[in-house]
Amino acid sequence: MASVPATMTAWTKTRPEVGGFAQVEHAVPSPGAGEVLIKTQSTSVCGTDIHIWKWDEWSRENVPLGTVTGHETSGTVVAVGEGVSTHSVGDLIAVECHLACWNCPRCEEGNAHVCENGSIFGVHGHGAFAPYFVVPAVNARHVPEGLDPGHASIQDPLGNAIHTLTGGPVEGATVAVHGLGPIGLFAVNAAKAMGAAKVIAVDWDNTYRMSLAKELGADLVLGKDDDVVAAVLEATEGRGADNSCEFSGAASALSNAIHSTRMGGYVNVLSVYGSGTPEVPMNEVVFRYLHLKGINGRKMWSTWDTMHDLLSRNLIDVDKVITHRMGIESFEQAVQLAMEGNCGKVVLDF
């Protein structure tokens, strides 16, 4: 670690208020047994970072003040801890932010993304809006050869999109994507790349992102001026979508997804509903034999395998989804831009 400085300046949640971030000096961490020290290359802004910026109820309950946040990231290994044989100095990696114990029943059954003893990198502990960070080596995933570090940093949201899509049929199916934030945009692109016969993209009034969805392959784009349920049924000869994916966190979008999915179809939900629990038309779910499923994170590691296959074959148009790249000094501007929504994915480079 001779070339690694002793201290660093990192964006830190210091005050219990909207914004509330400051650049604070921290010691550069040393990797413990089974860990790697990473020099950050790129970290992207996530919806979770916006929740933390707003200091909403979820953030107040989960994020300790003084935490360096940021969890969608890529970087280069600069030191390895005792017992690490899977990584070498110089390796480019991306982080799986769900830190698992690997011993509980959920981990042992292959669901480490919902580990009973798990925590989230950059939420419950220090993350990657910093020049250096440590993670368990198992969470430092090697990236496809030649991948741009900025592209490598978005594997968290791309993986979310793929995990949600694969909760139902994709190849040859009609897939409806409700909510066109960055994850929804990746879902549109990935659904096409994975062989969906038709992709229907739905948002409220973000014309910027609706246009992006069209460029990424959506066959039909719907907005606030459309009767979403009627339009989806018309586009599917009255049957409904085979696989509806809800990314918006809007109660109306969940209702539309349920009512516009075919008999025996799949409704996969990767959303946090911030304004109370949405009403779920359970009679529709029961009598139409709908498969309603909550999605959290990425399967470890089948989602990553699928994602790396798509990236290696250049089937994901990452450059279209990443609309803004800034230096880390522009962190506050980047979060504001992401909140306003006139963007796709915002990436901060170091």
Positions of PLM-derived features:
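C-terminal hydrophobic helical "lid"/dimerization subdomain
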Residues: 2-8, 39, 226-227, 255-259, ...
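N-terminal glycine-rich cofactor-binding segment
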Residues: 12-30, 47-79, 94, 115-124
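Glycine-rich beta-strand-centered segment in the early N-terminal region that forms part
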Residues: 29-43, 58-105, 144-146
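NAD(P)H dinucleotide-binding glycine-rich loop of Rossmann-like/cofactor-binding domains
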Residues: 62, 99-178
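Mid-domain Rossmann-like dinucleotide-binding core that forms the NAD(H)/NADP(H) cofactor-binding site
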Residues: 145-226, 230
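Glycine-rich phosphate-binding loop and adjacent beta-alpha segment
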Residues: 201, 214, 219, 251-313, ...
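Short amphipathic alpha-helix with an adjacent loop that forms part of the alpha/beta core around
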Residues: 228-238
